[in-house]
Amino acid sequence: VGEDEMTPGWTSYRRHLLYQTYDVTEYLQKGINGAGAMLAPGWYKGVMGLTKARNNYGDQTAFTMELLIRYTDGTTESVYTDPSWKGCDSPVVFAEIYDGETYDAALEIPDWSKAETTKGDWKPVQLVFFDTQVMRAQYAAKVRVMDRIPAKRIFKTPAGDTVIDFAQNMAGRIEVTAAGKPGDVIELHCFEVLDKDGNVYLDNLRAAKATMKYTFAREETVTWHPTFTYMGFQYALIVSYPGEPKAENFTACTLHSNMASNGSLE
């Protein structure tokens, strides 16, 4: 729900864990309603820092939710995450802040967050302890997609690589459209600068892979972007793409705090 990205954000989780609130009235329907969430390591347990350590704040991803219902007669009721919830593997088979995201469409479960869903290998969840005293409502601006920048050109480097150029450096992700068949792969490697000869330069990324990858499960046209990562980039190396890539197939989406603009430079 909502337009916020990369929630709950990066904080010192043992001292402050931010939560977000949303009005979900418009999503409710008569009869049985369902809710679900997709989780990734993020800053909490993903690879972070100069030492590339993992599990800096904990070794278990988790999700908690309270649904507060206000009835027309003025009474209220709360529904919480509890042992009755179930979980299963998602199509996001890999997600790291530094290294990117890998998505396998063959693992998709149609309508996975609806109450009537019966497909998928759902298993009981495991309850974990977390000190709720450190939970705080998010008071700062939330991260959102703030600009959409079409690719300016696709070109061949002197070394023969195919590269997308968005004509400005940014923090964000790439939205890609492609037509493929089962097993086809879209793979892009994001980077910031070309070397002095005009070739792909990756040394400043150190060990970060900054790669987004999508594998088709069926013959179709898809528009996809990663959800649990972001990159700093102006360019993207096309490692794999079904068909001939065209500039109109790629859009960069900038991600940053949702703040009002006071001016600009030309």
Regions found by a protein language model. Name each.
Residues 1-266:
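Extracellular/oxidizing-compartment recognition motifs
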